[in-house]
Swiss-Prot record:
Belongs to the NqrDE/RnfAE family. Keywords: Cell inner membrane, Cell membrane, Electron transport, Membrane, Translocase, Transmembrane, Transmembrane helix, Transport. The complex is composed of six subunits: RnfA, RnfB, RnfC, RnfD, RnfE and RnfG. It is an enzyme of class 7 (translocase). This is Ion-translocating oxidoreductase complex subunit A. Part of a membrane-bound complex that couples electron transfer with translocation of ions across the membrane. It comes from Pectobacterium carotovorum subsp. carotovorum (strain PC1). The keyword Transmembrane applies. GO terms for biological process: electron transport chain.
Amino acid sequence: MTEYALLFVSILLVNNFVLVKFLGLCPFMGVSKKLETAIGMGMATTFVMTVGSMFSWLVNEFILVPLDILYLRTMAFILVLAVVVQFSEMFVRKVSPELYRLLGIFLPLITTNCAVLGVVLLNINLSHGFLKSTIYGFGGAAGFSLVMVLFAAIRERLAVSDIPAPFRGSSIALITAGLMSLAFMGFTGLVKF
């Protein structure tokens, strides 16, 4: 049980996909302008990464490995993720049309989010079992969501701040992301895993 908790904390804080591995930067910068949009994107990404990790592990273990077609891994995983994203898109459209409108093009683009595909490929490369893959996917998604929500809250504050003209927009956003990355480096010694 401790091993799973350490894995979760490790991927959530110490090895965060956005701030340490630099995966998922497109939605991180694009969707994080409003807090409610970032929360919605975080929830959708959490669902996709967790369920995608589970199904990708199952596809790998019960289809790709037995049939010795490992060269189709990336294509198979993208297909699995596309199905999960399509399901989540239909769900969000039905449950919250306003959130669906706010997320816009970023919801279908979860399929090509490198953090989503990255967690699936890392699960296979690290030889995680089913439970570890699920925890790794959920922890990675929780870390992605945490960073995205924190960044959106900071950007909302920056939008009403008096920032010098050369630093407005993307400049201050990148500086803020860099400072957040430095702050997360403080967690480096937290978990030795």
